[in-house]
């Protein structure tokens, strides 16, 4: 596989202290205007600790890291071996911090983008049967 390089500029970072929050960099603070507590957002993260040539070549994984699950393409899983979108609920906004319940990312993970998540446009009816066959 040959990869073409391009640059992604982080707009903030995941922080895990007493609370979990997204710290938006000062130069992107204006982009938070209109975001309200209770809004759902979609985060685009860069799993910087999984960014190696070897891990980038992984295209199939066992979901949930369980070898009893069949090998599945990474785009059909939540594997951390490439950038993943996550959805979290905004609980509180203070200055350049967006507080959230939890996130499956490490402290210091770069946030590439944040988008409002209007359910009526982005959330099709859930079909839980497609993942119910997988083992945790």
UniProtKB/Swiss-Prot annotation:
Origin superkingdom: Archaea
Ligand binding (S-adenosyl-L-methionine): 48-49, 78, 106-109
Transmembrane segments: none
UniProt keyword list: S-adenosyl-L-methionine
Family: Belongs to the tRNA methyltransferase O family.
TsaA-like domain residues: 8-126
Protein name: Probable S-adenosyl-L-methionine-binding protein PH1056
Database matches in PANTHER family: TRNA (ADENINE(37)-N6)-METHYLTRANSFERASE
Pfam families the UniProt entry points to: TrmO_N (PF01980)
């Amino acid at each position: 596989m040959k990869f073409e390089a391009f640059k992604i500029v982080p707009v903030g970072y995941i922080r895990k202290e007493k609370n979990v929050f997204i710290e938006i960099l000062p130069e992107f603070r204006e982009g938070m205007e209109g975001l309200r507590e209770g809004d759902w957002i979609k985060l685009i993260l860069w799993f910087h600790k999984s960014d190696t040539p070897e891990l980038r070549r992984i295209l199939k994984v066992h979901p949930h890291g369980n070898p009893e699950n069949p090998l599945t393409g990474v785009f059909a899983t939540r594997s951390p071996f490439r950038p993943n979108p996550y959805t979290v609920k905004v609980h509180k906004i203070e200055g350049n911090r967006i507080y959230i319940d939890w996130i499956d990312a490490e402290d210091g993970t770069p946030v590439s983008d944040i988008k409002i998540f209007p359910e009526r446009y982005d959330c099709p009816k859930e079909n839980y049967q497609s993942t119910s066959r997988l083992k945790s």
